[in-house]
A protein has these predicted regions:
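A broad, low-specificity signal marking well-ordered, structured residues that form hydrophobic/aromatic
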Residues: 25, 103, 213
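Bacterial N-terminal signal peptides that target proteins for export
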Residues: 2-17
Length: 232
């Protein structure tokens, strides 16, 4: 069941435009009829409402161990934009273990905004024996971006959004370091830390010659909302 929290004196709104300069350059503007202002408006609307916690994940998915969750792998052949002749591809993470919050993911293209629907058949569950309902009702926990960093024959993992507002990026001839966060709230306080999370993403479909990828994100939590723009 979902639960609600009373609003604080002010539910704060944060708005960020971030350029991840690991291997791409920042570009301004968009050819699509959706942009940062749209996300900021949604964040304002959320900030004006009482926070509502998402419904709980199925118990069997909550109970997955680290290794069991790792055994649920997205099938590479089901990657978004695979076979479309585009420089980027998207792969997705399954909910479970510590990654229990639902994340909505959309593609922004010339036709508008289209939700990328979760499909359990896009995943290999390995040795896990989940009920069909739990698997299909899971939804996404996050996603990763692939791009040919070193050779045109292979698309490397270059950016990951998974868990709360955590993300990490990888450039050519680099190794992953610590993850970054979109926002940290009440860190190291006796009252306990609050973990805002990215509830929804909008990813612009790239052109066949694109060298950048634009991602918008909406953040939400008990005391804050946020709008973000990432350009790789």
């Amino acid at each position: 069941m979902s639960s609600t929290y009373p609003p604080r004196t002010a539910r704060h709104l944060f708005a960020f435009a971030v350029a991840i300069a690991a291997f791409y350059s920042f570009t301004a503007g968009s050819a699509f009829a959706f942009g940062f202002d749209d996300v900021a408006q949604r964040a304002r609307q959320l900030a004006a409402k009482t926070y509502e916690k998402p419904p709980d994940l199925a118990k069997e998915l909550q109970a997955l161990t680290y290794d069991q969750h790792r055994d649920i792998r997205f099938k590479p052949q089901r990657s978004r934009w695979r076979g479309a002749g585009l420089p980027f591809e998207l792969a997705f993470f399954h909910r479970g273990f510590h990654f229990q919050l639902p994340v909505k993911i959309n593609e922004v293209n010339a036709e508008g905004v289209q939700e990328i629907k979760f499909n359990a058949e896009d995943f290999d569950y390995g040795a896990n024996k989940l009920s069909p309902k739990a698997a299909q009702d899971s939804g996404f926990a996050g996603f990763r971006v692939h791009f040919p960093l070193h050779t045109s024959k292979y698309k490397d993992e270059t950016l990951v959004f998974l868990g709360a507002s955590y993300f990490r990026a990888l450039g050519k001839e680099q190794n992953y370091g610590v993850s970054a966060r979109g926002l940290a709230v009440d860190t190291a306080l006796a009252s306990g830390e609050e973990f805002p999370y990215f509830v929804e993403f909008w990813i612009e479909r790239p052109s066949p010659t694109a060298q950048t990828l634009t991602i918008y994100a909406l953040l939400d939590s008990r005391s804050v909302t946020g709008a973000y723009r990432f350009v790789l």
